[in-house]
Amino acid sequence: MALKVRVITPDRTVLDDSVEEVILPSSSGQIGILSGHAPLLTALESGVIRVRTSGWENIAITDGFAEVEANEVKVLVNTAAKGQDIDLEEARKAFESAKAQLDQVNAADRKAILDARKELKRTRARYMAAGGMA
């Protein structure tokens, strides 16, 4: 039995397809969803959603929520991009820049540290979805 997955941002639907499995980056760790999964509502962190049909596809996301109900997974996030649509070299450069920025943040500036960590997670997700950090 197929699992219907929709990944939706405020301005577009990134994925609307039937898949065999989806792995979500929840706030408590990765969650694998198969057909027949129990109903679930979970917070998502910036990371990579992996969906499996005949092969695996990666989608980089920022924070949001996922709802699982009746063999349907609805993912509502601020931003999302399919790995195949992300330039690997640009993603690598952005990730390296975010790492350097975090290293340079004033340790006393808690907001700056949080912002830099958030940017690092976002750029890491894009780099991983594009095929980096294998």
UniProtKB/Swiss-Prot annotation:
Listed NCBIfam families: ATP_synt_epsi
GO molecular function: ATP binding; proton-transporting ATP synthase activity, rotational mechanism
Family named by the database record: Belongs to the ATPase epsilon chain family.
Role according to the record: Produces ATP from ADP in the presence of a proton gradient across the membrane.
Record-linked Pfam families: ATP-synt_DE_N
Cellular location(s): Cellular thylakoid membrane
Protein name: ATP synthase epsilon chain
Source species, domain of life: Bacteria
Location, primary (coarse class): membrane
Keyword Transmembrane helix on entry: no
Oligomeric and partner information: F-type ATPases have 2 components, CF(1) - the catalytic core - and CF(0) - the membrane proton channel. CF(1) has five subunits: alpha(3), beta(3), gamma(1), delta(1), epsilon(1). CF(0) has three main subunits: a, b and c.
This protein's UniProt keywords: ATP synthesis, CF(1), Hydrogen ion transport, Ion transport, Membrane, Thylakoid, Transport
A GO cellular component annotation in the UniProt record: plasma membrane-derived thylakoid membrane
Species name: Picosynechococcus sp. (strain ATCC 27264 / PCC 7002 / PR-6) (Agmenellum quadruplicatum)
Ranges annotated as spanning the membrane: none
